[in-house]
């Protein structure tokens, strides 16, 4: 951990898609440790000591709780959304976890992926995938075939349109109403969610569309500054200052 800090790393996501030596992941139903492993507990403590932010996106609920119980400083969830809008999707955060993270002083950064922000879109995506697999087999085509790509694009647009910027704003609203403006920020996951990003929020150049929607909902300039950078910088600063005081 100290080596990575020396190399410039300032946050580490504890797990990804599968349970690892550190702890259990949200996408993995194995529950190898029932949360953090003993090694994972040491990793979190060492991250605190050297000044690396603990990122709890991708971890299971129990791993999330275990890490919060150990961490002496605020944590982050670098690209997670609100589970209320996607019931049963453990990769997103429940209200209980959002409240626990806020009590810790942390910040969750909202993921913009369609399946993360809208359960209807997620269900539609599964149906589209099944149809496309069958259609490709029936027509003896590969996804790389230009005609197949055109068909998939047109079929998806017709049967499962992308979510909107307004739906992303709903996630910000929920967090703010639940725990306040100091605990939410921009996670995006632009490079991780494939072709599922909302209409009007396909890349960073479109952030003004989201900010305009939030302004319409009554957010202030100071609120947007907190969402844009102040909240995550506050956590980063707290982690660094704690580490500076360690032997």
Regions found by a protein language model. Name each.
Residues 18-23, 59-65, 82-85, 115-118, ...:
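Active-site environment of divalent metal-dependent phosphoester hydrolases
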Residues 148-166, 170-173, 221-236:
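C-terminal helical cap
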Residues 8, 54-56, 79, 108, ...:
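Conserved, mostly hydrophobic/aromatic
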Residues 94-150:
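Aromatic-lined glycan-binding groove of carbohydrate-active enzymes
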Residues 21-34, 197:
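Glycine-rich phosphate-binding "P-loop"
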């Amino acid at each position: 951990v100290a080596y990575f800090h020396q190399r410039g790393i300032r946050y580490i996501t504890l797990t990804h898609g599968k349970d690892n030596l550190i702890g259990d992941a949200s996408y993995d139903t194995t529950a190898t440790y029932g949360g953090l492993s003993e090694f994972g507990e040491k990793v979190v403590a060492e991250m605190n000591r050297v000044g690396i932010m603990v990122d709890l996106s991708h971890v299971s609920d129990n791993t999330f709780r275990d890490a919060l119980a150990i961490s002496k400083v605020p944590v982050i969830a670098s690209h997670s959304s609100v589970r209320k809008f996607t019931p049963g999707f453990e990769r997103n955060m429940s209200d209980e976890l959002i409240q626990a993270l806020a009590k810790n002083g942390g910040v969750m950064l909202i993921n913009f992926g369609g399946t993360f922000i809208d359960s209807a879109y997620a269900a539609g995506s599964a149906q589209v995938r099944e149809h496309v697999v069958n259609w490709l087999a029936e027509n003896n085509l590969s996804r790389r075939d230009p005609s197949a790509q055109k068909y998939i694009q047109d079929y998806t647009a017709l049967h499962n349109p992308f979510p909107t910027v307004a739906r992303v704003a709903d996630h910000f609203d929920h967090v703010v109403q639940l725990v306040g403006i100091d605990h939410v920020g921009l996670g995006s996951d632009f490079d991780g969610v494939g072709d599922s990003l909302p209409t009007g929020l396909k890349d960073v150049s479109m952030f003004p569309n989201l900010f305009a929607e939030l302004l319409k909902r009554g957010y202030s300039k100071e609120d947007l500054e907190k969402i844009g950078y102040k909240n995550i910088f506050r956590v980063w600063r707290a982690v660094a200052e704690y580490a500076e005081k360690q032997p």
